[in-house]
């Protein structure tokens, strides 16, 4: 990797074959100025960033794997980010516990002593020198089952009942290096994002149902959080109680009867399938009575119509009732 090491020279008539541009492969004209970078040559117009194609003449540039980049694109594509100052690391880099640091930033988080010549200790997400680590209250110590080194809680991944540094593993699906929040399905490890893709989604809240920590129910050909499977009208969860379906929605008994039933002509109650339908009206069993004697009728009883109300056979043959009815009609 080189920066600003190119020289501007001119094609001379030496009798040898003219140089060719590294980008366009065209030869340089006689006395044409060009960039000479190591063993490669470039037209002035072809000396561009391989990523954004911006001109690099007069700017800071980097050569990496025989390609040239502007400073911004090189940092974005290849430069690590310091875990302490969050700036790009150009030049010497220190790697520790799956993080990168500037040499000057690799210091103890307590006393700021440089850690370049001593062992760094991880403690609850911080980096400490030996003395500062000794002052901290001791917690349960885990040693990685793979590298046998100490595992800080922030890096701890328990897999098959053994402690590991999480960064020793990669996601089964996307191959991303795992962190301590990795999830397990059978013996396979996944990052949280890929784990979510393996889970069902609640039809009500549209969020992932975590089968390892959340209860769910499968009904109406859909998955639900247990407390999200509820009546479409009153929103009370069913929690395993009986529900009724209509047009793809679930209802409790009261709201279902309200939705599909008929109201009693007398008391205005809704009793669903127990209603008696006669003369264009609906009656609940308690209100289905004779218009004449107020006797409770059975739905199989033969009745006659009087003012669009039921009249029992006995009242119809009663002479006293017939006289009263005749007098009323006068």
Curated annotation (Swiss-Prot):
PROSITE patterns named among the record's database cross-references: LIM_DOMAIN_1, LIM_DOMAIN_2
What is one term from the GO cellular component aspect held by the record?
cytoplasm
One of its GO biological process terms is: cell-cell adhesion
Subcellular location field = Cytoplasm; Nucleus
Which cysteines share a disulfide bond? none
List the SUPFAM superfamilies hit by this protein, alphabetically. Answer: Glucocorticoid receptor-like (DNA-binding domain) (SSF57716)
Q: What is this protein called?
A: LIM domain-containing protein pin-2
PANTHER family named among the record's database cross-references: LIM DOMAIN-CONTAINING PROTEIN (PTHR24210), LIM DOMAIN-CONTAINING PROTEIN PIN-2 (PTHR24210:SF7)
Superkingdom of the organism of origin: Eukaryota
One GO MF term, please?
metal ion binding
Which keywords accompany this UniProt record? Cytoplasm, LIM domain, Metal-binding, Nucleus, Repeat, Zinc
Give a brief account of the tissues where this protein occurs.
Expressed in neurons and intestine.
Q: Which residues form the signal peptide?
A: none
Question: What's one Pfam family here?
Answer: LIM
Q: What is the lineage of its organism?
A: Eukaryota, Metazoa, Ecdysozoa, Nematoda, Chromadorea
């Amino acid at each position: 990797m080189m920066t600003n090491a190119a020289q501007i020279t001119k094609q001379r008539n030496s009798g040898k074959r003219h140089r060719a541009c590294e980008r366009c492969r065209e030869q340089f004209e006689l006395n044409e100025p060009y960039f000479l970078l190591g063993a490669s040559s470039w037209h002035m117009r072809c000396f561009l960033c391989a990523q954004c194609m911006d001109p690099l003449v007069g700017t800071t540039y980097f050569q990496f794997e025989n390609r040239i980049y502007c400073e911004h694109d090189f940092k974005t594509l290849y430069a690590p980010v310091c875990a302490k100052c969050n700036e790009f690391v150009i030049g010497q880099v220190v790697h520790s516990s799956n993080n990168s640091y500037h040499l000057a930033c690799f210091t103890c988080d307590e006393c700021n002593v440089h850690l370049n010549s001593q062992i760094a200790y991880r403690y609850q997400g911080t980096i400490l020198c030996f003395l500062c680590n000794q002052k901290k209250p001791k917690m349960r110590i885990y040693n990685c089952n793979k590298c046998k080194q100490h595992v800080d809680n922030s890096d701890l991944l328990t897999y098959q009942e053994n402690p590991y540094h999480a960064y020793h593993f990669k996601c089964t699906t996307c191959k991303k290096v795992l962190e301590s929040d990795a999830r397990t399905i059978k013996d396979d490890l996944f990052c949280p994002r890929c784990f979510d893709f393996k889970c069902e989604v609640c039809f009500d809240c549209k969020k992932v149902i975590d089968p390892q920590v959340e209860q769910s129910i499968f009904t109406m050909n859909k998955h639900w959080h247990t407390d999200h499977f509820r009546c479409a009208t009153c929103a009370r969860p069913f929690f395993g109680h009986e529900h009724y379906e209509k047009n793809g929605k679930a209802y409790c008994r009261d709201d279902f009867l309200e939705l599909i039933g008929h109201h009693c002509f007398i008391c205005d109650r809704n009793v669903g399938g127990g209603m008696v339908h006669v003369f264009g009206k609906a009656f609940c069993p308690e209100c289905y009575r004779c218009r004449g004697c107020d006797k409770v009728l059975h739905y199989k009883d033969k009745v006659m119509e009087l003012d669009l109300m039921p009249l029992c056979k006995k009242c119809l043959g009663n002479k006293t009732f017939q006289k009263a009815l005749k007098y009323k009609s006068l």
